[in-house]
Amino acid sequence: MKRIGIYAKCNHPDAVMVARDVVGWLRGRGLEVFLEKKLAQDVGDAEQSHDRGSIPGMVDLIIVLGGDGTLISVARQVCGRDVPILGVNLGSLGFLTEITRGELYLSLEKVLKGEFSLSDRMMLEAVVWRHGLEAGRFSVLNDVVINKGAIARIIDMEVSVDTAYLTTFKSDGLIIATPTGSTAYNLSAGGPIISPGLHCLVVTPICPHMLANRPLIVSDTACIRIEMKLRDQDVVLTADGQVGMALEAGDVVEIRKADRCTRLIKSPSKEYFEVLRTKLGWGER
């Protein structure tokens, strides 16, 4: 690996400081470093300043300095290129950014020697159809959420799995999550935690009107089709809680497994269930 891209949470002073140190460390080893323009400005180094979206196509490795939100944003930029991502946690929870600040340079040494393993994380593709035409398309690492606005009423959503009608959810919203996203909004809404190696997705209603409506796990080969049965309501679709669009009556949302995945470099010192236990504060035996 000779060409390294760095993304950081630029409004986080620690992230900018760590980025500056990492740039010096990498260049001291003869490696070429690529920075997004805002980060290059913040660290005072315009030598390799590039548009955010162009970096994944130019590098062999991406380092993300921040939290899970920063990494999720970068994952959409990578868009299926076979570029591994090393996530360094400078935030709070950090399910995806497994590497701690103290482990950063030891982990980098191992990665540059090729001594690392990858966790391939399934992604989703969500398409919004309006009057038979594509109105929006989103790549998703964590979840697709359909949610009501501040003063909207309960939403009616007719849901099918492939061609089979499932039910019409009457709820505050609906979450379609990957195994990676099962520890995000899905978990808060009472959905199950799913090991990232499993090939499935979970459909979780948000505050359903019917107590019998419960989260449903389906195969990752399924297409989830959601038809909006709205009555002049304020309803939005969000992808990973970061981008999205307003939905209208009659809109159809189709969600399926994407052709691409996100490749995360695993921590050399932690297993998934150790991370889970630590982050959720589960007790020891």
Swiss-Prot record:
Disulfides per UniProt = none
List, alphabetically, the Pfam families matched: NAD_kinase, NAD_kinase_C
State where NAD(+) binds. Answer: 68-69, 142-143, 153, 170, 172, 183-188, 242
Q: Give the subcellular location.
A: Cytoplasm
An example GO biological process term is: NADP biosynthetic process
Per the UniProt entry, the Enzyme Commission number(s) are 2.7.1.23
| Keyword Kinase assigned | yes
- Where does this protein chiefly localize? cytoplasm
Quickly give the catalysed reaction.
NAD(+) + ATP = ADP + NADP(+) + H(+)
Report keywords, A-Z: ATP-binding, Cytoplasm, Kinase, NAD, NADP, Nucleotide-binding, Transferase
Coiled-coil annotated spans = none
Which GO terms of the molecular function aspect are on file? ATP binding; metal ion binding; NAD binding; NAD+ kinase activity
For this record, the Gene Ontology CC terms, alphabetical, are: cytoplasm
Q: Is the Transmembrane helix keyword given for this protein?
A: no
* Gene3D superfamilies cross-referenced by the UniProt entry: Probable inorganic polyphosphate/atp-NAD kinase, domain 1 (3.40.50.10330), Probable inorganic polyphosphate/atp-NAD kinase, domain 2 (2.60.200.30)
The prosthetic group or cofactor this protein requires is: a divalent metal cation
Residues of the active site are 68 (proton acceptor)
Role played:
Involved in the regulation of the intracellular balance of NAD and NADP, and is a key enzyme in the biosynthesis of NADP. Catalyzes specifically the phosphorylation on 2'-hydroxyl of the adenosine moiety of NAD to yield NADP.
Report the sequence similarity comment from the record: Belongs to the NAD kinase family.
Query: What protein name is recorded for this chain?
Result: NAD kinase
Starting at the broadest rank, the lineage of the source organism is:
Bacteria, Pseudomonadati, Thermodesulfobacteriota, Desulfuromonadia, Desulfuromonadales
Q: Name the gene that codes for it.
A: nadK
